[in-house]
């Protein structure tokens, strides 16, 4: 057992590990009372995610409470946008709002290349502090939004139910959309490299809205740009594991496994055993407990974790939810999730 390298990093690299590492998407956030108390004093989401002291404190809250195997930067997938010349705000309960949606060739051509060390030095500072604080007790995770999902936000101007505006662009002016996606791919790759240089040991790309695409449109508008990000990052950081997450990905799991990422994060609508059959042996999995299960009983949570871990046995696996933890989740149930993940070997013995 290698005590000097965090468990999650060893697992993500495909090394033999004593148990699957466990962390949780959105593990820092509204379900935690300490977060809500801090939010009362700092109501602006952008302040909480862009002030290095606040971002660091929030990132550390779940680590102090539950000691997960991964500590993820508290930030937002839209945080790099101002560095490219796109202003946005995040309104509580409404989500992100883009002040001037991108819908013309001139707007795309006017976008600036992202220079994260200048426009986002706070991210580098937080990642460095996290590495210092957690040492080898946990891996530090960075993350970004994938090009399609960023484009969906900046073209629509806000969250959308049917993505009519960006789909109209995709099917009326595909070249315009491809230029925007290409700009985002290059900028996001640059941003990920900056996160890795600053201390991130594993990185995750969220293509949250790619599940809204048909498989053939995923092949045109999402996958090539996911691949471009992966290729550009791997050129500089070949040993940094990369994870890809898509919400509603059941129709494109095989395609996700062909993007070059090391790990595919499955949502909870796919049975773990089925998901693994659809991925190459070399590609690992993350997930995929239903976040709604954390409103259930402790026994239900433990039982599902045993089921997921059993099905993933023999493959590279990081235990996680199939989506971010939901607001209103009892904090005690988050604790049950983490403790069950850490004690899963004993739970499997008892249940067999």
From Swiss-Prot:
The keyword Zinc does not apply. Homodimer. This is Uroporphyrinogen decarboxylase. Pathway: Porphyrin-containing compound metabolism; protoporphyrin-IX biosynthesis; coproporphyrinogen-III from 5-aminolevulinate: step 4/4. Catalyzes the decarboxylation of four acetate groups of uroporphyrinogen-III to yield coproporphyrinogen-III. It is found in: Cytoplasm. Belongs to the uroporphyrinogen decarboxylase family. Gene3D superfamilies: 3.20.20.210. InterPro entries: UROD/MetE-like_sf, Uroporphyrinogen_deCO2ase_HemE, Uroporphyrinogen_deCOase. The keyword Lyase applies. Its EC number is 4.1.1.37. It comes from Prochlorococcus marinus (strain NATL2A). The record marks 76 as: Transition state stabilizer. Keywords: Cytoplasm, Decarboxylase, Lyase, Porphyrin biosynthesis. GO terms for molecular function: uroporphyrinogen decarboxylase activity. It catalyses: uroporphyrinogen III + 4 H(+) = coproporphyrinogen III + 4 CO2. It comes from the Bacteria. One of its GO terms (biological process) is protoporphyrinogen IX biosynthetic process. Its main location: cytoplasm.
């Amino acid at each position: 057992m290698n005590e000097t390298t965090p468990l999650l990093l060893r697992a993500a690299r495909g090394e033999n590990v004593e148990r699957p590492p466990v962390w949780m998407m959105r593990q820092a956030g509204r379900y935690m009372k300490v977060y809500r108390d801090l939010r009362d004093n700092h109501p602006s989401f952008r302040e909480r995610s862009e002030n290095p002291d606040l971002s660091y404190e929030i990132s550390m809250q779940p680590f102090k409470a539950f000691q997960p195997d991964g500590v993820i930067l508290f930030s937002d997938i839209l945080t790099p946008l101002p560095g490219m010349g796109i202003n946005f705000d995040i309104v509580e309960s409404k989500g992100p709002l883009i002040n001037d949606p991108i819908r013309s060739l001139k707007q795309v051509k006017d976008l600036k290349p992202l220079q994260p060390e200048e426009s986002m030095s706070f991210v580098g500072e937080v990642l460095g502090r996290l590495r210092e604080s957690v040492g080898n007790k946990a891996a530090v995770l960075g993350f970004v939004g994938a090009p399609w999902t960023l484009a969906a936000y900046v073209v629509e101007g806000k969250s959308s139910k049917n993505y009519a505006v960006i789909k109209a662009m995709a099917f009326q002016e595909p070249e315009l959309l491809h230029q925007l996606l290409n700009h985002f791919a290059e900028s996001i790759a640059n941003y990920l490299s900056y996160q890795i240089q600053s201390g991130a040991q594993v990185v995750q790309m969220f293509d949250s809205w790619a599940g809204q695409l048909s498989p053939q449109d995923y092949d045109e508008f999402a996958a090539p740009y996911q691949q471009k990000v992966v290729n550009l990052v791997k050129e500089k950081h070949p040993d940094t594991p990369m994870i890809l997450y898509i919400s509603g990905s059941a129709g494109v799991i095989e395609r996700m496994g062909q993007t070059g990422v090391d790990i595919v994060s499955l949502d909870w609508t796919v049975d773990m055993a089925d998901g693994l059959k659809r991925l190459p042996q070399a590609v690992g999995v993350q997930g995929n407990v239903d976040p709604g299960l954390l409103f259930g009983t402790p026994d239900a949570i433990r039982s599902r974790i045993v089921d997921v871990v059993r099905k993933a046995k023999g493959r590279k696996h990081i235990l996680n939810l199939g989506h971010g933890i939901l607001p209103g989740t009892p904090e005690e149930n988050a604790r049950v999730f983490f403790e069950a993940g850490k004690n899963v070997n004993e739970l499997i013995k008892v249940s067999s």
